[in-house]
Structures are given as structure tokens and as C-alpha cells.
Amino acid sequence: MTLRCRCASVACLLIAIPAALASQRPAGAVRQEREQAAREVPKLAETLALEPGMIVADVGAGGGAVSVVMAKWLGPEGRVYATDIGAAQLAEIRAAVAQDALSNVVVLEGGESSTNLPNECCDAIFLRDVYHHLTRPGEFDASLLAALKPGGRVAIMDFPPDPGSSIPAGVPADRGGHGIPASIVVTEFTRAGFRHVTTMSRWPPEDDRSRLFLVMFEKP
């Protein structure tokens, strides 16, 4: 086989990898996540006072559905940092981004105690169903503060613990179960130097079935 043929074969393989990874999850589940993200992102953008062209981080991006929809909302001049932990999660996010041929999403591996985001890179950051898993929240909150521009906002979307549920391994015991009270989120973020802006008891507000709350903070 000639070098040109080998290079062409490798290129075809690299193109096929994202599609193969995307196909590992049920198409219905992926579609449902995209539809939910399409409903939620405009409301999140309004809550965070976002504008097209801004730079936003989706910390703990999961399958990448919200990152993809947010990147489209922000437009080609905007940017989304999509972060998560672990090769499988990062590959799934890259597959979602490649499927929509987006050039304004930066996929970044996060850490247990740090976002690994550049200093003062973001106008806003959000974490959905993520914060209650953190084992070193104080260090992580300091990392979030460092990643925001002055006046930037962070939104935490999470759920209160069920009484009697088990606390994930390594997570602080004051959570009271699997989940986290909104009051603890407020305490920890204000301790880290954030200003508390608002707490919404349900997120999204119009979804009566949702157990999520939203707490928003601003970097002074």
C-alpha cells in the first residue's frame, strides 16, 4: 500500500470514529437530550444574561447536548468550553460536536479539584447535575472563580437529597444524601468569594416534574 493510500485510510478511520462513538448510545436518548437542551438553553441564556458572541463553559457536559445547542445559540463568534472527566465522556462530547460540524466548541478534560479552564476566560459557567458529585468543592469553587471574568456569572443546577439516600463516595457528609441542599451551595460559593444573585426553587421554572433548583452567583 502506498503512503497516500495509507494516509487516506487513516483519514477515513478518524472521520468514522466520532460517528461510531455517537452510535453507541440509543438514538432516542440522544434525540431526547437534544430536544430538552433546545427548550432549556434559551431560558438559561436569559437567566445568565448571555449574548451571542460570549464565551461560556459547560462544566460536566455529559453527552454534550447542552454544549452543542449553546454553541449554536452563541453563534460563530461565541465559544463553549465543554468539560468532563474521563476519556469515554470526552469522546462522546467530541462525537456530538463533530456530528454538527461545530468549530466553536473546545472540549477540555476537567479534574476533581479544578475546572482546568484558562484564567478569566468565561463570561458565564454552568453546572447541571454535577455539583453534588464534587469531592473537593472548596478547591473547585476557587477554580470556577478564577475562570470567570469580573462580573461573570455561574449557575448551579442540582437537586436536593432524598432522605435516607446514600452520599456518593468521597463527597462531604453535610450533603445529607445523594444530592445537595441549595442552602449549602449558597454557603460554599459565598465562602469562595462569589456574590449570590438568586435562587430558583425549580429549574426549568415551567417544568412541574423537575426536581432541579438553580442557584446563580456573580464574580465581583
Predicted regions, residues:
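Conserved class I S-adenosyl-L-methionine
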Residues: 153-186
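A short glycine-rich, Lys/Arg-flanked "PGG" loop and its adjoining helix->strand segment in the class I
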Residues: 71, 138-153
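Core SAM-dependent methyltransferase catalytic element
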Residues: 198-220
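Hydrophobic beta-strand segment of the Class I
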Residues: 56, 125-126
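Class I SAM-dependent methyltransferase SAM/SAH-binding core
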Residues: 57-115
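Short glycine-dipeptide loop
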Residues: 52, 76-77, 148-154
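Class I SAM-dependent transferase core
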Residues: 20-57, 62-66, 95
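A short acidic, Gly/Pro-enriched loop at the edge of an enzyme's catalytic core
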Residues: 115-125
